[in-house]
Amino acid sequence: MADPVEQFEIHKIFSLGHIGGQEIAFTNSSLYMLLAVGAVALLMLGGSAGRRLVPTRFQSMAELSYEFVVNMVRESLGEEGMKFFPLVFSIFMFVLMANLIGVIPYTFSVTSHLIVTVALALIVFLTVLLYGLYKNGLKFFRVFVPSGVPIYILPLIAMIEVISFLSRPVSHSVRLFANMLAGHITLKVFASFVTSLGALGVAGIAGAALPLAMTTAISILEVLVALLQAYVFAILTCIYLNDALHPGH
């Protein structure tokens, strides 16, 4: 049976040179991140070019994506939070496309790598922190002091809130990474069962029916997980950004 973790290995495609003794390389991970960005650009440019009263498929998909994120941001952050729409939309579409591309057989899932999800989570975390301090000054630290907390337990609650705030990039990134990693490993294991049993002949082919059915079911589930995890990552981004706009609420 093939190693189910082998699909996550990063391979160098070509070198970009050396900086400080360290090689900078263009890898398969870099390639699929560019493909995800390119797919988003193609969808949005294709959907906005030559708009029609009766929308084309590209136009319908682009408008649906746009309206979905607009409604998410408006409901979570209000009109004041619409300034963050470009950030939330970019993150949502990148994660969505990267997830969906990763579901295609023999491709590479960039969101199954923790370094990618941590980078996205840190962008959100630093945006919340820096904009919160810029907009609210020291009042931003009210986010660590929930209103209505009795004074005698306030130090304990404040400490818990600080730890919770600092751990956001961890939970935000690990949730996406773990879900995508687990799904791809499970799919690879069942697909390997099908291949191994099919190689045994007629009896093996009959025995491969159940793993094949499970592989098909998991593949469909993986598409749903790809959509759901992009939404979860985006809605958590909105929830965290709300603290920058309204600390202490």
Curated annotation (Swiss-Prot):
Annotated localization: Cell inner membrane
Gene Ontology MF terms in the entry: proton-transporting ATP synthase activity, rotational mechanism
Keyword Membrane: yes
Keywords, ordered alphabetically: ATP synthesis, Cell inner membrane, Cell membrane, CF(0), Hydrogen ion transport, Ion transport, Membrane, Transmembrane, Transmembrane helix, Transport
PROSITE patterns reported in the protein's UniProt record: ATPASE_A (PS00449)
Bilayer topology: Multi-pass membrane protein
Record-annotated membrane-spanning stretches: 30-50, 84-104, 114-134, 143-163, 193-213, 220-240
Single GO cellular component term: proton-transporting ATP synthase complex
Pfam families (UniProt xref): ATP-synt_A
Key word Secreted present: no
SUPFAM superfamilies the record matches: F1F0 ATP synthase subunit A (SSF81336)
HAMAP family: ATP_synth_a_bact
Assembly and interaction partners: F-type ATPases have 2 components, CF(1) - the catalytic core - and CF(0) - the membrane proton channel. CF(1) has five subunits: alpha(3), beta(3), gamma(1), delta(1), epsilon(1). CF(0) has three main subunits: a(1), b(2) and c(9-12). The alpha and beta chains form an alternating ring which encloses part of the gamma chain. CF(1) is attached to CF(0) by a central stalk formed by the gamma and epsilon chains, while a peripheral stalk is formed by the delta and b chains.
Family, similarity comment: Belongs to the ATPase A chain family.
NCBIfam families in the record: ATP_synt_6_or_A, PRK05815.2-4
Function: Key component of the proton channel; it plays a direct role in the translocation of protons across the membrane.
Protein name, entry field: ATP synthase subunit a
Source species: Afipia carboxidovorans (strain ATCC 49405 / DSM 1227 / KCTC 32145 / OM5) (Oligotropha carboxidovorans)
Gene name of this polypeptide: atpB
